[in-house]
């Protein structure tokens, strides 16, 4: 069996896959954000991860004697200068567990974990380059992925899609993180937000300003939510089409949004490969699969 550990900005995750690739365990705990706040300080995230990890490991303790290798997300993406303190919680814990179990430790990154989780659970086994759309609270990137590398070919030049969603949600009185509740409450609307795409790069700050204006003018929040999701989906459609003709794998929590899924499915048909929303949000399943493949 192979153990994956991931400590992202808002979720503590551990997962185990078997020798044959079956998901044996998938445990997660969301970090707590105070009411009215739009996020956590990294130091607070580290503190909460260090409290959560022993609890999650306790839940999978019966499998620990069978673990052959451990893998952990050591940084946000596979770049030399990629760094966030929250991942130190996972790496520190993984080092200790590796030593105590006397098994090898593999270091990977959060982004590749997302891609692997989505690809495996969607049964997407590409034979050539494809585009992964990474949509989360801290990231909006288009990645050209092959068997060796994931190259950023487009991104937001200001705020990520998830941050746009959470800012608008908190403005409208929702608890952070807001994406799931906004998805559930989104109502039909005639309101539109500006779409700003140059090549495969996107700007969302103009959409945020217009959403604030709509809210102050009395447009119902539920309609603004739909306008936000439409803006994100339309921006992604344009950015991907500008990148070329590829199969597409959406990953990250924002990708699970209903409006975005429907829009991209209509735009790209069989070329877009959505997995179950459970494997789009932050998890350690992909890290466990990476562990299995690299062992």
List PLM regions with ranges.
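Short glycine-rich, Thr/Ser-proximal phosphate-binding strand/loop in the N-terminal lobe
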Residues: 8-47, 151-152
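Phosphate/pyrophosphate-binding loops at sites that engage ATP/ADP/AMP, CoA/4′-phosphopantetheine
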Residues: 56-69, 219, 239-246
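Short beta-strand-loop/turn "lid" adjacent to the catalytic site in phosphate-handling enzymes
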Residues: 58-95, 99
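Glycine-rich beta-strand-to-loop/alpha-helix junction loops that act as flexible
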Residues: 72-75, 136-138, 249-258
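Short, well-ordered amphipathic alpha-helical segments that serve as non-catalytic structural scaffolds
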Residues: 27-29, 48-63, 235-239
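A short helix-loop
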Residues: 7-8, 15, 24-26, 126-128, ...
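A contiguous, well-structured pocket-lining segment that forms one wall/lid of small-molecule binding clefts
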Residues: 184-248, 254-272, 292-295
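Conserved phosphate-binding catalytic cores of ATP/NTP-utilizing and phosphoryl-transfer enzymes
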Residues: 103-131, 289-293
